[in-house]
Amino acid sequence: APQPAVPVSFKPRPPLSQVSPKLIAKELLTPKQFRCFDKLMQKESNWNSKAKNPSSTARGIGQLLEPTYRNLGMRHSKHGVTQVVAALAYIGRKYGSSGPCGAWKHWQKHKWY
């Protein structure tokens, strides 16, 4: 006979608007991939959701360009969690299974990802 399902317990959690973008990334990634993503976001914006590149349309935590947001089917958001989701979507499409560590390796060589 099949085993009964293990009950799932949920912790009460704050709305995403009240959660740190860095914490969301940490929850979504393996520890190794998070370390790479953290280094990358520190270099790109120091995790500043209001960061703007003076020489391009890149802005936010991931410093994504406007065309990149459009290619992802997204719009730039002032909200850091949305910016992290967009950066992770971009990294997933561009670097595949190498993920944030692939993006970080590329950044170290070229100073962009």
Residues covered by each model-derived region:
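N-terminal prepro-regions of secreted/extracellular proteins
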Residues: 1-11
